[in-house]
Amino acid sequence: MQKEKLLIIVPYRNRKENLSLFVPHMEKWIKEQNIDFSILISEQSDDGEWFNKGSIINCGFNERKEKSDYVCIHDVDMIPSSKKDCNYSYSKSPIHLASRVQQFGYKLHSKNYWGGVIMCTNQMFEKANGFSNLYTGWGKEDIDFGVRLQKCKYKIYRRNGRYDSLKHEKHKWHPNKPFDKSLLDKNRKLMHMMRNGEHDFRKDGLNTVKYKIIKNEKISEHSEKITFLLIK
């Protein structure tokens, strides 16, 4: 077994069917790779706020970083399907694993796509100041994180990972309000500002995230490795 410990953070909200398939699949998958791991389901509460993926990732990392050496940010609706290529072993460089995903025709979505499944060491995550807390809902926060790593002089490598996509309803940005396109436009603008050096990532991320832990518990009675955080 490798000595480095892996923390898998799953940003989550209202995907119970996906989660029920994801957890047992991933637990078996990582065990077969002989990796010391833990899985953290980081959920934002239905508190009337817009979904903020970056903040709950940052919260999860802050709460569990002392028990790991490297971190994998993993979407709950993607499960690995190729044992040869979906390798979660430790690397000294950032690694993007989800390069061949079913929903994108098992092809790379775009050259700047770092979403789905990405890994890096804890030190790299901290140097990049984690994820931005300013993106609303889904969209562009993963590209922003890739840009952060690159601005820290890290080269992101891709493993030829093949992932199946679990069926799910359309992303729900808010528990009560309909989708607001202006928020996605705001995300795009923020991402371009990051790329162009107009946004200082050192002032937005791990060091500015604010949260309150509502619940912290095991998600499986059969395993100590899988835990759940409910965050406000």
Write out the residue ranges for each language-model feature.
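Hydrophobic targeting segments
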Residues: 4-10, 26, 38-41, 60
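Short beta-strand/loop segment that forms part of the nucleotide-sugar
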Residues: 10-11, 20, 35-47
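Short, well-formed alpha-helical segments that are part of the catalytic scaffolds
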Residues: 15-30
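Active-site nucleotide-sugar/metal-binding loop of Leloir-type enzymes
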Residues: 55-70
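Short beta-strand-to-loop acidic/aromatic patch adjacent to the donor-nucleotide binding site
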Residues: 67-81
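Conserved donor-nucleotide/metal-binding helix-loop-beta segment in metal-dependent transferases, i.e.
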Residues: 82-106
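Conserved nucleotide-sugar donor-binding
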Residues: 114-129, 145-147
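C-terminal catalytic/acceptor-binding lobe
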Residues: 134-137, 143-232
